[in-house]
A protein has these predicted regions:
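Active-site residues of response regulator receiver
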Residues: 59-61, 90
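Non-catalytic signal-transmission and effector/linker regions of two-component phosphorelay proteins
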Residues: 1-10
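The short loop immediately C-terminal to the conserved phospho-acceptor aspartate in CheY-like receiver
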Residues: 54, 61-64
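Short hydrophobic/Thr-rich beta-strand motif most characteristic of the beta2 strand and flanking loop
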Residues: 32-41, 47
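Two-component/phosphorelay signaling modules centered on CheY-like receiver
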Residues: 9, 18-36
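Short amphipathic alpha-helix used as the core "switch/output" element in two-component signaling
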Residues: 46, 67-83
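Short, flexible helix-to-coil linker/hinge segments that flank and couple to helix-turn-helix
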Residues: 96-103, 108-148
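Conserved active-site segment of CheY-like receiver
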Residues: 16, 89-93, 112-114
């Protein structure tokens, strides 16, 4: 194994749309070590517990479980993989969706309109400890935490 391969960030993908997952994984596979994927809450928690990815791309609206979607996955996965960082990747830019996963501990939130290059950059940034938000969401997040 080359030095470059050993340095790849371990990434998992959670989304209930198989074709979307496949497309994202195809985009990311040259840059990251894709260690797992899942489509629902119970499968996601199990996959994260088993693979212990460094970063999870997490859709907000995922079926199963108790109806909490991405926030529920994050909360239930934490005990099994406490160092995993979560980056929400969703079509939704609704304040309640953004707030739910950020309050649950996600390191960032980007929308599915993101380019492949920007998604790769966002994954690297959250892995390094930075918070990442789509430009459209950054103002909302700031105003929420500033009490505006």
């Amino acid at each position: 194994m080359s030095e470059n391969e050993t340095a790849k960030i371990r990434v998992a993908m959670v989304d209930d749309h198989e074709m979307f997952r496949a497309g994202v994984i195809a985009t990311l596979r040259d840059s990251f070590d894709i260690v797992g994927q899942a489509a629902d809450v119970p499968g996601s928690v199990a996959m994260i517990a088993q693979t212990k990815p460094q970063v999870v791309l997490l859709d907000v609206h995922v079926p199963g479980g108790e109806g909490g979607g991405g926030a529920e996955i994050l909360a239930k996965s934490r005990p099994y993989s406490p160092t995993t960082v979560f980056l929400a990747l969703s079509v939704s830019d609704a304040p309640q969706d953004v707030g739910s996963v950020i309050r649950a501990g996600a390191q960032g939130y980007v929308t599915k309109t993101i380019t492949g290059a920007d998604l790769i950059s966002s994954i690297k940034q959250v892995h390094e400890g930075y918070a990442v938000f789509s430009p459209k969401l950054a103002g909302f997040v700031l105003s929420t935490f500033q009490g505006v």
